[in-house]
């Protein structure tokens, strides 16, 4: 009896340990050995994503500096406004009143170089109607007399203090010289013959310091504008003032 030899296949040990060099799924395919990634397994719930609040931005130094400056200025404005309101309620300020009472022309001469020399004496009445406010009239004032666009004379007011509810009469001498005034005298004469009066303007720029009780404030300026109609400009005669009106304005 012949013996049959059985041959069993033997696995190659190198082939058992070798890994495939090619992917199980072709390239470009969305499937792999883990299944379809686009499908969520039935036993796995989808995760909920809670949006996180963005982190707070830190204020820069410039922003803080701007805020502090703005708050300081706001408080300063409120404090100044409150102080002014308190002063107004306590002292009840009233505007001073001014009037031109007398005007005299002492010189009105046309020179050979066509310049006009003039000299005026003006009497001004200043009234302070306030009960608790005094006015210091400081140096550096200026008063001028004008006819249309021509300045005829100029001068200055004296330095003095005007007390409460006080009326002060101020006497001012003014002189001036107008260049190229050959036709100015003729124009004044024609104005007088045509209308019977001559319109003049008197301007006052006066630095003052106001005193509230015992508190003396910083310097401000009184601006006074007076329109005066006179009958003539006769030399060495008191000019008759037909009408006059003055306006007052305060400038810081």
UniProtKB/Swiss-Prot annotation:
Region (Disordered): 1-46
GO biological-process terms attached to the record: abscisic acid-activated signaling pathway; defense response to other organism; positive regulation of abscisic acid biosynthetic process; response to abscisic acid; response to osmotic stress; response to salt
Lipid bilayer topology: Single-pass membrane protein
Induction, per UniProt: Induced by abscisic acid (ABA), osmotic shock and drought stress. Slightly induced by salt stress.
Function text: Plays an important role in the abiotic stresses-induced abscisic acid (ABA) signaling and biosynthesis. Acts as a positive regulator of ABA-mediated seed germination inhibition. Functions downstream of ABF2/AREB1, ABF4/AREB2 and ABF3.
Taxonomy of the source species: Eukaryota, Viridiplantae, Streptophyta, Embryophyta, Tracheophyta
Record keywords: Abscisic acid signaling pathway, Cell membrane, Cytoplasm, Glycoprotein, Membrane, Stress response, Transmembrane, Transmembrane helix
Main location: membrane
Record organism: Arabidopsis thaliana (Mouse-ear cress)
Null allele phenotype: No visible phenotype under normal growth conditions, but mutant seeds show decreased sensitivity to abscisic acid (ABA) during germination.
Subunit structure: Homodimer.
Compartments where located: Cell membrane; Cytoplasm, Cytosol
Sites carrying sugar chains: 121, 154, 166, 180
TM ranges: 70-90
Tissue-specific expression: Highly expressed in seeds and at lower level in roots and senescing leaves. Expressed in leaves and flowers.
Entry GO terms, CC: cytosol; plasma membrane
UniProt-listed Pfam families: LEA_2
Protein's UniProt name: NDR1/HIN1-like protein 6
């Amino acid at each position: 009896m012949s013996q049959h030899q059985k041959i069993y296949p033997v696995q190659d040990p190198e082939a058992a340990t070798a890994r495939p060099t090619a992917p199980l799924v072709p390239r470009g395919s969305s499937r792999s050995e883990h299944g379809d990634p686009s499908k969520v397994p039935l036993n796995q719930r989808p995760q909920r994503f809670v949006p996180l609040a963005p982190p707070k931005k830190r204020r820069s130094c410039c922003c803080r500096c701007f805020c502090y400056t703005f708050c300081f200025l706001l408080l300063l404005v409120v404090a100044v406004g409150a102080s002014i309101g308190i002063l107004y309620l306590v002292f009840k300020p009233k505007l001073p009143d001014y009037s031109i009472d007398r005007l005299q022309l002492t010189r009105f001469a046309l020179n050979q170089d066509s310049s006009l020399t003039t000299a005026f004496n003006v009497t001004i009445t200043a009234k302070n109607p306030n009960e608790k406010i005094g006015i210091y009239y400081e140096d550096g004032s200026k008063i001028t007399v004008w006819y249309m666009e021509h300045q005829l004379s100029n001068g200055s007011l004296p330095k003095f203090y005007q007390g409460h509810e006080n009326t002060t009469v101020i006497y001012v001498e003014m002189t001036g010289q107008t260049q190229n005034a050959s036709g100015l005298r003729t124009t004044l004469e024609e104005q007088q013959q045509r209308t019977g009066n001559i319109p003049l303007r008197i301007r006052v720029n006066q630095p003052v310091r106001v005193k509230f009780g015992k508190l003396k404030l910083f310097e401000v300026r009184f601006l006074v504008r007076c329109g005066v109609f006179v009958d003539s400009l006769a030399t060495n005669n008191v000019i008759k003032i037909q009408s006059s009106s003055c306006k007052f304005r305060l400038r810081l």
